[in-house]
Regions:
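Eukaryote-biased detector of low-complexity, proline/serine/threonine-rich segments
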Residues: 503-575
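Asparagine-centered strand-capping/turn motif at beta-strand->loop junctions
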Residues: 472-476, 623-629
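Residue-level detector of conserved catalytic or cofactor/ligand-binding positions
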Residues: 632-643
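The feature marks non-catalytic terminal segments
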Residues: 238-443
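Low-complexity, acidic Ser/Thr/Pro/Gly-rich terminal tails and inter-domain linkers that flank the onset
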Residues: 415, 421-463, 579-614
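Bacterial N-terminal signal peptides
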Residues: 58-69
Length: 645
């Protein structure tokens, strides 16, 4: 037996893939002596050294071990409304839309869900949500996660929410530090210029036409809400000024003038049960989110309520929304165009269709003659796709969709070779690159193409090998030719085809399947958040600047398939994922491949304050081993004390 005064470690034999190998719970008395037993006889082989100490102390357990990364969060499946005929109907709406919208909020659950659904699902506009913080300082009704871990959970809930509203998600570096006494304090803690720079960067990147934000006064909620509103207001002019944050311009971004900016009216700007005919003050615009959409099978507010229910750690209602009046109110704050004080829509004065693109070539109509001609052709193909859409035979839209895709690609090539101004080229390319992605997805939906890259394991370690099975299916009577199939992985990973054939002709209802062997690089980076808490300021340090603003780092392994439909090539890209049955009620769960340490140690609590005379406290040590072969490991647990002052 190793006595408490003996510092010699004991070996710990780790069986393969043991998961949580051992949980050591020791009762600690203020004297430093384990209560009830002397020494360590646990088979886990952990040596603990206890020393006498001063009257009051802080006990910290220090382990030489790899920090346990954040656990992989479930990647939920797409909703049925994004698949089949309904998904194609949604996609065709996007093809004819040329405008974009962004909402700026302080925390997850501040957003106007019904409006996001209305603009994205109902009108096909590009929509985005810029949430300044990840909600790290909030409460958690589901589990023990707090602070940074809670921020990860709430970020994942936002991604689950966006399955309903279709919006893109962005974040700044701001840390949600909890209650604030003033806007000034919030700006000081976050760093005004740093967070304003993030907001400006995201606006310059996404280039929205209309931006809405939270109220800048007390009716908008807490100090974080008001601060976010003020920063968004300042970003209206800053994003358009090349002298503000010039380093972004040097990196390749260009200034962007938001056309109109609105502030929420009356707090959250959401009202239920009030008649849509009730008059509103001058300068206030009402959006009818209670309108019924037959494709969605409900109102925008109803689908928005389902989206909002994803904020489960914040105890959002799980009851489905009921049909009826639902509106959101917005006060015009700034505009780059002439406006009427009796607007009926946030996009009054802005073309929401493809003619929005014409605004980028004003004064260059002669040089842009080719573009104007191509744009008219594109609008015609979109119109024919709308006319030929048939829920029972969605592939009837393929001729129009393929023609539209070809026009977009030709326009992009012609713009590069044109004499248009650099600014015009930049903004047209920005919009048309998204349009090509939308046409690509629409063609795949019309064919009923399914790409399923499934890994045999969701958690892997450096140096390990795992299999990926890939299935490609054509669920329409229109044949396609699968020309290339590949896996894409980080540098240093090795990929090998191990069986099957996933290229060739794919007829009606046909499938192709194959297998790949993937070896993780010995020095592979662990899957973890790309942001890290800076404990000197309430702002995150960014570990990879290329990812700034994104919800999470991209999946490490992707499957990429190219197929030929008619005379156009279509490329599909899907993250390789692992599927499993969860321990709770529901359908299958999915997660992306996650790289974890082979050996992880977690101590709880990490810091313990235990005054003299206090009751015994429990210390828990969890060891997780992920490799397939057994190993011998030695773990030390030591006590560090310091006087209480």
């Amino acid at each position: 037996m190793v006595r408490p005064s003996d510092p010699a470690p004991m070996p710990l034999l780790l069986p393969p893939r043991a998961g949580i190998i051992r949980q050591i719970r020791r009762a600690v008395q203020p004297s430093g002596q384990p209560r009830g037993r002397r020494g360590v006889s646990d088979a886990a082989g952990v040596s603990i050294k206890w020393r006498s100490n001063v009257n009051r102390f802080i006990l910290t357990l220090c382990l030489t071990a790899v920090l346990l990364p954040a656990p992989a969060h479930a990647q939920l499946e797409p909703l049925p409304l994004d698949e089949g005929a309904t998904g194609l109907a949604m996609a065709i709406r996007q093809l004819g839309a040329g405008a974009s919208y962004m909402e700026v909020t302080a925390h997850p659950d501040d957003e106007n869900n019904g409006l996001l659904v209305m603009l994205n699902r109902g009108r096909g506009l590009r929509t985005s949500l810029l949430t300044v913080t990840r909600g790290d300082g909030g409460q958690n009704e589901l589990g023990p996660e707090i602070l940074e871990a809670l921020g990860i959970l709430r970020s994942a809930e936002l991604m689950a929410m966006h399955r309903y509203d279709g919006a893109e998600q962005y974040f700044t570096r701001a840390y949600e530090f909890g209650y604030s006494f003033s806007v000034e304090e919030t700006l000081e803690k976050w760093g005004k210029e740093e967070i304003l720079a993030d907001i400006v960067r995201i606006i310059r990147t996404v280039r929205p036409d209309v931006v809405t934000h939270l109220p800048t006064t007390g009716e908008g909620g807490g100090q974080h809400h008001q601060t976010t509103g003020r920063l968004a207001r300042e970003a209206f002019e800053a994003a358009a000024d090349p002298e503000r944050f010039p380093e972004q311009i040097q990196e390749g971004l260009r200034p962007w003038q938001v056309v109109k900016m609105y502030e929420r009216f009356r707090g959250m700007g959401m009202c239920r049960g009030s008649p849509s005919t009730e008059p509103v003050p001058a300068g206030v615009t009402r959006m009818d989110t209670g309108a019924y959409d037959p494709i969605l099978g409900g109102t925008y507010a109803q689908l928005g309520a389902e989206a909002r229910s994803m904020h489960r750690c914040q105890s959002m209602s799980q009851l489905r929304g009921l049909p009826g009046e639902a509106t959101s109110l917005w006060s015009l704050e700034n505009s780059a165009i002439e406006t009427d004080d009796r607007e009926t829509d946030l996009f009054d004065g802005i073309d929401m269709g493809l003619d929005r693109y014409k605004d980028f070539i004003r004064g260059q109509e002669t040089e842009a003659a080719f573009f104007l001609e191509g744009l008219e052709a594109l609008k015609g193909h979109v119109g024919r796709a709308e006319e030929t859409f048939d829920a029972l035979e969605p592939w009837k839209t393929l001729p129009a969709l393929r023609s539209g895709l070809s026009v977009v690609r030709q326009l992009r090539a012609d713009i590069v070779a044109s004499t248009l101004s650099d600014d015009a080229k930049y903004d047209l390319e920005h919009r048309l690159s998204l349009k090509e992605e939308q046409f690509t997805r629409a063609v795949a939906l019309a064919h009923g193409i399914a790409l399923e890259p499934l890994a045999e394991a969701g958690e892997v370690v450096p140096g390990s090998t795992f299999a990926v099975d890939l299935l490609v299916a054509n669920q329409s009577p229109e044949p396609v030719d699968v020309t290339t199939v590949e896996l894409v992985a980080p540098e240093g990973w090795t990929l090998r085809r191990s069986g099957g054939e996933v290229s060739g002709a794919l007829g009606a209802g046909g499938t192709l399947s194959g297998s790949f062997e993937v070896r993780v690089a010995d020095d592979a980076r662990y899957s973890r958040p790309y942001w890290e808490r800076n404990h000197t300021v309430d702002r995150f340090d960014i570990l990879d600047e290329d990812l700034l603003g994104l919800p999470f780092a991209p999946a490490p392994v992707h499957a990429r398939v190219t197929f030929r439909s008619g005379d156009v090539d279509v490329v599909l890209d899907e993250a390789v994922r692992y599927r499993y049955e969860g321990a709770w009620v529901g359908t299958e769960k999915q997660q992306r491949v996650t790289v974890l340490p082979a050996l992880s140690v977690n101590v709880s609590p990490r810091v313990m304050v235990n005054p003299t005379g206090a009751e015994s406290r429990e210390i828990s040590v969890d060891v997780v081993y992920k490799r397939t072969e057994a190993a011998l490991s030695i773990i030390h647990i030591t006590e560090h004390t310091r006087p209480y002052k």
